[in-house]
């Protein structure tokens, strides 16, 4: 089961990639921007603008050609409480406890000094310890991957995009009565005769959401009092898959979270839009709004438990100072990023830098923080390679508090 949990988010990312979709800790994955603290509203390139800010699509230079991103993928996992190992351990302890009960006879069970009775006592104590250690513990992950084709034009630039973002969270409800019953068996093994393991009430929860977008972006640049202002919009079809995995903690298997038994899906329409303006040769400011139409989608009801996933507008402002050698950028969310109603909201700010010492090499770093303090703050870094300025390979990694780590990669080509 440990293997299932450790690769749960990675499996989601792979499935998204196979479906030609994309996504991230934001509502997008783009390796260059992710390496720069998740920024990009003002600093993104025209070829990746459709993933970040559709207005950037209109900022192509005269000699820029068609750009194809195939693919962009990334994943992030946070497990500050080491929950994956604790859940694996409790699975082993449950099996051990049940095994000791199955293999003991009545005479040995009633004799507290027998070896078999002591085994029951020890197994009950181990299980109670594990339950106690699970109280209030959570683990979460985010992932994405996808494609985009951007076609610049002096009149109207166009891009085609398929992107998605995925998030998953594992948590538990530990019933104190379960611990008390197991402590009783630990003290008096014969008490197991009147305690049915199947009647224990503690539960494990797995919530997961995958939101995929399929859209066509259009963008155009205007001259307003000598200031180049770009405007972009992305109408998109939006599909959502929600998973509500609710089971007894003693039967919890994180590999089952994405089973169709716990899945609900929904299809709707949404819009992204953005602005970008250049001030002089070195300054760009941007504003983007993702998912401008709010949507609340209920999960399937499982074991009497239902949750609601919230898709709501996320408005982000950004600024960038750039030269041929150096780019400095900062982004800040003006609205909260919502998810399941059972979870806390986040609101991100990020700063980043890129140094381009050679025409084919870029080195990047950044920092991203949640001002609501509900998600991990992370340091980011990455490199970009562009041999012959035709094939672009971007790699990024992140590490932060609460045992948070992640990685991403992107391959793009220009023609």
PLM regions and their residue ranges:
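Subset of outer-membrane beta-barrel
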Residues: 25-415
């Amino acid at each position: 089961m440990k293997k299932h949990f450790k690769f749960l988010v990675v499996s989601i990312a792979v499935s998204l990639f196979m479906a030609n979709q994309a996504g991230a800790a934001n509502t997008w994955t783009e390796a260059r921007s992710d390496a720069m603290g998740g920024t990009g509203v003002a600093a993104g390139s025209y070829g990746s603008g459709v993933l970040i800010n559709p207005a950037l699509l209109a900022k192509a230079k005269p000699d820029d050609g068609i750009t194809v991103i195939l693919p962009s993928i990334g994943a992030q996992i946070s497990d500050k409480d080491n929950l994956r190992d604790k859940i694996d351990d409790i699975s082993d302890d449950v099996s051990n406890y049940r095994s000791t009960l199955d293999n003991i006879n009545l005479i040995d069970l009633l004799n507290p000094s027998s070896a078999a009775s002591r085994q029951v006592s020890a197994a009950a104590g181990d299980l109670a310890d594990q339950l106690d250690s699970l109280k209030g513990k959570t683990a979460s992950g985010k992932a994405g991957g996808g494609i985009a084709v951007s076609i610049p034009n002096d009149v109207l630039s166009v891009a085609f995009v398929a992107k998605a973002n995925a998030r998953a969270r594992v948590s538990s409800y530990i019933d104190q009565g379960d611990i008390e019953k197991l402590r009783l068996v630990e003290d008096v093994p014969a008490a197991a005769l009147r305690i049915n393991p199947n009647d224990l009430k503690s539960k494990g929860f797995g919530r997961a959401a995958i939101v995929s977008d399929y859209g066509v972006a259009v963008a155009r640049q205007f001259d307003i009092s000598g200031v180049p202002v770009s405007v972009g919009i992305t109408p998109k079809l939006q599909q959502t898959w929600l998973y509500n995995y609710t089971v007894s903690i003693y039967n919890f298997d994180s590999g089952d979270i994405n089973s169709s038994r716990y899945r609900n899906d929904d299809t709707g329409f949404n819009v992204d839009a953005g602005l970008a303006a250049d001030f002089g040769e070195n300054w760009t400011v941007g504003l983007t709004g993702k998912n401008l139409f709010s949507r609340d989608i209920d999960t399937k009801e499982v074991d009497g438990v239902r949750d609601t996933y919230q898709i709501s507008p996320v408005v982000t402002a950004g600024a960038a100072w750039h030269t041929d050698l150096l780019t400095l950028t900062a982004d800040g969310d003006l609205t909260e990023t919502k998810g399941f109603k059972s979870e806390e909201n986040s609101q991100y700010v990020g700063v980043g830098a890129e140094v381009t010492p050679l025409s084919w090499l870029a080195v990047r770093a950044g920092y991203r923080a949640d001002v609501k303090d509900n998600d991990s703050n992370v340091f980011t870094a990455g490199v970009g390679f562009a041999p012959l300025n035709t094939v672009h390979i971007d790699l990024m990694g992140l590490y932060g508090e609460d045992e948070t780590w992640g990685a991403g990669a992107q391959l793009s080509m220009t023609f």
